[in-house]
Amino acid sequence: MNFSFVPLFLVTLILLGVVSNNNSITISATILLLMQQTALVQFVPLVEKHGLNLGIILLTIGVLSPLVSGKAQVPPVAEFLNFKMISAVFIGIFVAWLAGRGVPLMGQQPVLITGLLIGTVIGVAFMGGIPVGPLIAAGILSFVVGKG
């Protein structure tokens, strides 16, 4: 009889997500556990192949939607010349580049995702963090362990 620790790990993530009030991890782990334990398991390779790209698309839509709703305005060109705006642009570029380093690392060494998720959950639960970390954390990790 083969025993898989994956369901136990997913249940642990669900519990940690509930305790840390991290809905992203709670919902994601719940959906994956349901998929794994039902006939929906046939769609796991599809999620594995396209899930990250779809998630980034949804995140980008969420970030851009205040522009469309009018809650945020595109600043005039002159405002792009102050220190805060220039800093924001360069930090945005750096963070996007950093996350870009993380994606290949997560693909080449998927076992590291487990550590990144555990660290993210601990950071949210006990350090007042927010769950936006896995891609950035993977980018930082790529400096520590090498790009691939």
UniProtKB/Swiss-Prot annotation:
What does UniProt give as GO cellular component? plasma membrane
Spans through the membrane? 13-35, 50-70, 80-100, 121-141
> Record keywords: tRNA-binding included?
no
List UniProt keywords, sorted A-Z.
Answer: Cell membrane, Membrane, Transmembrane, Transmembrane helix
**Origin species:** Neisseria meningitidis serogroup C / serotype 2a (strain ATCC 700532 / DSM 15464 / FAM18)
Q: What Pfam family does this protein match (any one)?
A: DUF441
Does the record bear Cell membrane in its keywords? Answer: yes
Recorded family membership: Belongs to the UPF0756 family.
Fetch the InterPro entries from UniProt. UPF0756_TM
- What is the protein named? UPF0756 membrane protein NMC1845
Source domain of life: Bacteria
Compartments where located = Cell membrane
Q: What membrane topology is given?
A: Multi-pass membrane protein
